[in-house]
């Protein structure tokens, strides 16, 4: 069954509120799409139907309560302005986004399931302001941080596969003293990679902490 079912349940249990669901629809016949439908072509009988999956789900949650828009300065708000012409032209206003997927480089293809920068770009622009921090708990090759950096946001990412460190460094063009320009804002960019010896245990540790929190919540 769809993993998003578990995701919604877990996020609600830990206190987040469900807000939206967006469908990312990939072009029909795209190379990264599974060809499950071919089974019926070989066996044209009932019970051999497996449709090709051409979409993925983006689920949006928020903290309880309303966002305090008054806390955002006029300057930050203006610098984070969304291009409404692009918003309309590319149909961001729909709950289904048609965006072509991308293939990871051959070097890293066995490690990651690539997604287009445009997908991250829309989400970062729609749900954060310049200067805020974007968190990606499944960093992969660093796409989220690359896009966030380009859009003037800070970014923190977690990745348990140490083999991807080289790819992350390569994509972020590590240079702690480089002076970059973000949407007309000059700032000192600092990129740091921290390696934890217990990284591979974090998944189990987090699950245990969540289960402990849920048991405590239910007992009360």
Regions found by a protein language model. Give the residues of each.
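Core catalytic lobe of class I
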Residues: 1-167, 211-220
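S-adenosyl-L-methionine
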Residues: 169-215
